[in-house]
Amino acid sequence: MGTKNNSSDKVYITDKKTLKEFLEYERQKYGRKNARMPLICIGERSYLWKYNVLLRKTEYYVNTGNKLMGTIYRIWLARYQNKHHIHIPINTFDRGLKIMHLGPILVNGNVRAGKDISLHINTSIVAGGTNNGAPVLEDGIVVGVGAVILGNIRLAKNIAVGANIMDPRV
């Protein structure tokens, strides 16, 4: 139960305990006082935290097979993604995902990302146009503003992808 630690495997939140662990870990990264989703968002950090909670709760309800709540949260997440242009599919990032600023972020559903990944605005992590391979991000990666990571590539642990980089070989 819980998550798989290998970055190339899918990440699953399959029980309430794992959901709480994810949210508590990410709450500390965002500097929030509690792990609850804010009802009224004031400031950029509130919107980002709300997105993070929606993403993780959607993962939980979909992975546990709760069709009603899974559908409700998928719709809620999709509306929030379209409103704020942050498109991160469920079950792609391990715990510790931190979005630095509101703005366009696009992630392919086949991407596998490890723990403690930071994403800046205007980033794309997508499959290449000529193959079906999607990037694999190891633990502790910071993706800079405007970076594009594409194709069948594996990024090492604890690196930073520079701002406005667009190279499939990074």
Where are these regions (language model features)?
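Terminal amphipathic alpha-helical/low-complexity segments used for targeting or macromolecular assembly
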Residues: 1-84
